[in-house]
A protein has these predicted regions:
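GG-anchored amphipathic helix commonly corresponding to the ABC/SMC/Rad50 NBD signature/C-loop
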Residues: 1-4, 28
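Walker B catalytic acidic pair
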Residues: 7-8
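C-terminal lobe/lid and adjacent interdomain/linker elements of RecA-like ASCE P-loop ATPase modules
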Residues: 16-103
């Protein structure tokens, strides 16, 4: 299966255009493997699998970790991407976005 990697494909776009890009990527993913690095929830909600990459420093050494998220953790992450992981309105919006996303 051909693989496409898009690193920060959301650079310079937002909202509605991000949703259109997310749909286009979902369409490509029906026949190809697609890996997307994004900061836009409009793109992230289209993913079949959602991974969160976290960076930090431990003992003076830069570290990275990758975690697959599902269910409520995914709602929380989309709400975080919307700007308010603990806010009820952002969580409702995240749930709506995930519910509307077509995979």
């Amino acid at each position: 299966i051909p693989t496409f990697v898009f690193d920060e494909i959301d650079q310079g776009i937002g909202g509605e255009v991000g949703g259109q890009v997310g749909q286009a990527l979902a369409d490509v993913a029906t026949e190809h493997q697609v890996l997307v690095i994004t900061h836009l929830p409009q793109i992230a909600v289209r993913a079949d699998r959602h991974l969160v990459v976290s960076k930090g420093v431990e003992g003076g050494v830069a570290t990275s970790s990758v975690e697959t998220i599902l269910g409520e953790d995914r709602v929380t992450e989309i709400a975080r991407m919307l700007g308010d992981p603990d806010g009820a309105a952002a969580r409702r919006h995240a749930e709506e976005m995930l519910g509307r996303a077509v995979h």
